[in-house]
Amino acid sequence: MKSLLPAGWPRPKGYSNGISASGRLIFTAGVVGWDEREYFQSHRLDGQFAQALRNVIAILKEDAAGPEHIVRLTVYVTDIEEYLSLRDELGPIWKSIMGSNYPAMALVEVKRLVEHAAKVEIEATAVVEE
């Protein structure tokens, strides 16, 4: 896996502009921040973000992959201002779950998600080198 950074561009903080990888592909559905019983333990965006990331990792583990294999994330939030106000809290959450992997990412604000209580939903693409 190789992070792509065009010459002269500043290094982005918390993500990569692009990733080049080859191998076995794994795609997740949109994953929300509920537990294995489909219960939201947190009604805060940061708590749901942490659980959604843990859920993504649990899915990847089913095919012998982990956070280091994630090459792309699309993060959907219902309130981008809330997300931005929690950046200081989200950074340590990210590090504790994802380590120092910073995939290509998009952050998209949506009116609402299918699960009414969900504040965040994450789709992931992972590549496991073979």
What do the PLM-derived regions correspond to, one by one?
Residues M1-V71, V77-E130:
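N-terminal presequence-like segments and the immediate start of the first folded domain
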